[in-house]
């Protein structure tokens, strides 16, 4: 497997991992804002991007093995949403490779259960899975709307997310179903105390997809985490605030 990775800039290596249904185009503005200080690797997760059909993964372990093999041996990792969950699992498995974490709108568990209330209700998630099976384009638009909802610049965020989808192409084959299985099954709560890398947890106060409380939980459970709430921001907090997010990342890096 060979990942598609968009690389720009000079400096310490920093990988960007997007969330479900998106592609690496969504990182363009943030990548440009970071490129003066980092060598940025915007990763197309398997099944996404222009050549989506050529790259596949069928388990979280296989995905982490591919990331570990194809990206630099020492790097910072920034993950958004599902990408943040993958980043945490990668950091847990490969602590010598992943030096720092930046977690944007992420969570240890996406779906609520009996002892986790900071996620999407199981019934709502099951309904979304059915929507994806019935019409992926319609389901993706619904998902984009959830990502933009609550943001003070929701209309602009939704427009930019849709432009990213249009330019980057649709996910191929089993990629949407694989991503949904990860969202359903990943539960990192027991792993968080063993993730010892410095971590910057950033969360939009108005996130309509992953509750702000999930970000607060992450920051409290990760041993070396800092928490940054972004007022007026929704789930896609970096899309129209790339300069502010990039500055927070640089400041965090300077402290660690």
Give the predicted meaning of each segment.
Residues 61-75:
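Conserved acidic catalytic loop of the alpha/beta-hydrolase fold
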Residues 79-83, 87:
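Gly/Ala-rich beta-loop-alpha elbow adjacent to hydrolase catalytic centers
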Residues 92-93, 98-133, 175:
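Flexible "cap/lid" loop of the alpha/beta hydrolase fold
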Residues 133-186, 190-191:
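Conserved alpha/beta-hydrolase catalytic His-Asp/Glu region
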Residues 233-246:
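Catalytic histidine-centered segment of alpha/beta-hydrolase-like enzymes
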């Amino acid at each position: 497997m060979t990942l598609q990775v968009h690389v720009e800039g000079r400096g310490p290596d920093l990988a960007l991992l997007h969330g479900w249904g998106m592609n690496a185009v969504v990182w363009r503005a943030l990548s440009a804002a970071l490129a003066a200080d980092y060598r940025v690797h915007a990763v197309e997760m398997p099944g996404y991007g222009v050549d989506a059909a050529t790259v596949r993964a069928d388990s979280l372990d296989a995905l982490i093995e591919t990331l570990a093999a194809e990206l630099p041996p020492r790097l910072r990792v920034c993950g958004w949403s599902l990408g943040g969950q993958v980043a945490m699992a990668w950091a847990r498995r490969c602590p010598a490779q992943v030096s720092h974490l930046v977690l944007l709108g992420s969570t240890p568990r996406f779906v609520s259960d009996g002892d986790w209330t900071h996620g999407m209700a199981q019934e709502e998630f099951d309904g979304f899975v059915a929507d994806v099976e019935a019409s992926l384009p319609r389901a993706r638009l619904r998902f984009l709307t959830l990502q933009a909802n609550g943001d003070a610049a929701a209309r602009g965020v939704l427009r930019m997310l849709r432009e990213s989808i249009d330019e980057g192409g649709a996910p191929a084959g089993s990629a949407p179903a694989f991503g949904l299985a990860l969202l359903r099954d990943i539960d990192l709560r027991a792993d968080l105390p063993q993730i010892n890398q410095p971590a910057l947890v950033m969360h939009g106060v108005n996130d309509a997809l992953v509750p702000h409380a999930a970000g607060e939980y992450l920051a409290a459970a990760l041993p070396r985490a800092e928490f940054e709430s972004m007022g007026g921001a929704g789930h896609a907090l970096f899309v129209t605030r790339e300069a502010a997010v990039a500055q927070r990342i640089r400041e965090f890096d300077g402290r660690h």
